[in-house]
């Protein structure tokens, strides 16, 4: 008579099989969602916009940190830094570094991205009427500089991210620095910057989709 496996081993075998039975359908559904085009286009940008809306009433705390530690921070480099990823991308293309798209396709996609970003940002600015931290006007939400910077960073990612992750890392580092500087310069709330980043990313995603 063959040996009978101990009860504990049988139970262990049953327990080990259960995840396979129950997780496979769930895994297939999860894979279907994450592979969907709409998910690929929105899984970063939408959460950033939602975060911007969610922290709207908590931005004063971050402004107070600025007032406590760097009250005299006033530098205009963010006026130029926002364009840096796009300038570098065009420079790489001009020097013959192969990108994802042809010149024509890249310029059309980028033009769509700019048009979408500008229209969305300005429409919200003129309807939300959020006062800037420095009280200069009521066009604070969302941050146009941050939207431009993240739109440009996403362009770089689309065109050169597959060649090296450092293109993407560098571009988004510059974009993040732009957003932070807008807060340090007392021109925007944290909520403005988060929403602007999300809008910029979504604009490029849609611009390259069209």
What kind of feature is each model-predicted range?
Residues 46-49, 81-91, 116, 120, ...:
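Lipid-exposed faces of alpha-helical membrane segments in multi-pass integral membrane proteins
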Residues 39, 73-84, 100-105, 109, ...:
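Solvent-exposed, acidic/flexible segments
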Residues 125, 130, 134-210:
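Membrane-embedded catalytic cores of phosphoryl/pyrophosphoryl-handling enzymes
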Residues 1-98, 105-110, 210:
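N-terminal targeting leaders of membrane proteins
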Residues 45-49, 107-123, 151-152, 194, ...:
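Hydrophobic, lipid-facing residues on alpha-helical transmembrane segments of integral membrane proteins
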Residues 57-64, 119-127, 145-149:
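Hydrophobic, membrane-facing alpha-helical anchors
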